[in-house]
């Protein structure tokens, strides 16, 4: 979409014209995809400061919408967007070492995850509230390292572990959670419950 503005008074501008460069009309065929697109925009809206352009985050959002438009697994695509947005904006959790003591986890082993502390925590430092399997850790790190979106669903356990870890990060570090923003947009929000 191209929008052309002319300056107005204060922060307001006058919209002169808009043209659509690219549409994602296939998303409209799936309520799940529509919901994921809305949730993705809530993630970005929450994490990106107002009036601060973030072209790399915009590019990830466009790739996300393209993936949904082309039939990517909806839940996995949304999790990928969340992981990448966190990484690009400097909020990615520490997954390669204990956030307290720096100890590296054993390769191929699960790790305790503590969103409040910002990553994995070894047993000696008290562990974390969640367990991320070796597969979920590998997948998370791989998602951060690539621009691709999945073409196939992930194993249920890995998807759920990553979903839970992201939800805990959101609850501990966002001023308004993605769940709350999505509910607010649908008229069901009743305020923060924590």
Roles of regions detected by a PLM:
Residues 1-194:
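Non-catalytic alpha-helical scaffolds and adjoining flexible linkers that form interface surfaces
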């Amino acid at each position: 979409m191209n929008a052309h503005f002319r300056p107005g008074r204060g922060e307001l501008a006058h919209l002169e014209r808009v043209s659509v460069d690219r549409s994602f009309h296939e998303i409209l065929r799936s309520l799940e995809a529509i919901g994921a697109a809305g949730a993705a925009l809530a993630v970005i809206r929450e994490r990106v400061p107002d009036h601060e352009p973030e072209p790399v985050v915009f590019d990830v959002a466009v790739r996300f919408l393209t993936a949904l438009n082309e039939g990517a697994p909806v839940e996995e695509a949304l999790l990928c967007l969340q992981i990448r947005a966190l990484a690009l904006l400097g909020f990615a959790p520490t997954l390669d070492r204990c956030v307290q003591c720096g100890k590296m986890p054993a390769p191929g082993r699960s790790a305790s995850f503590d969103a409040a502390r910002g990553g994995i925590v070894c047993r000696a430092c008290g562990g974390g509230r969640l367990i991320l399997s070796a597969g979920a850790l590998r997948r998370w790190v791989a998602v951060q390292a690539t621009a691709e979106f999945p073409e196939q669903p992930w194993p249920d356990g890995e998807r759920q572990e990553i979903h839970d870890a992201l939800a805990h990060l959101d609850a501990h570090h966002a001023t308004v959670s993605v769940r709350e923003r999505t509910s607010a947009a649908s008229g069901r929000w009743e305020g923060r419950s924590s």
